Amino acid sequence: NADGGDWLDAYTRQEDGFKAGDLLTVGGDNYLLVQRDHRENGVYSRFNAVRCNQTITLGKWVKSTEPNDFGEYLNIFTPYATTPAYMVTQLTGLNKTVIGSVLGGTVAVIMPAYPIDVNVPVKCHYIDSTMEFVEREFTVESMDCTDVNTDAEGNIGGILRLQIKLSP
């Protein structure tokens, strides 16, 4: 049920057990369930959902255990999670075509919750205006964990909101 742009209302059967932070695939697009509407009728749940417009990879830099040909121990990007996410620049609003070309400022990210620290490297993958596959690296500046939760088994769930900045 679309209400414009990248956002829509998603209705799920209550017995399906969907919750904020879950991903749904509809017609080849990934949608992130962001917020549950508590006006339910006992049969279905209604969520605000956003169409994911990027795939991001979370990782960490690890110093190589072996020197290169010049005797240097290089830092190697080691990914630990790849997920669909919704990214928006503060300058472009919902215009997702400009996200990859941000040269300054910050980018807001809404994504499923993962263990993450400030300053963790985030790689964004997209196809630019010339139809080339591009990867850019960002660094997490701040995060909002208000809607992140942990269940009895220690599994992290919910929605994580980040502010990221293009790495130098």
Regions found by a protein language model. Name each.
Residues N1-P168:
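Short, conserved turn/kink motifs that form compact alpha/beta structural patches or helix kinks used as
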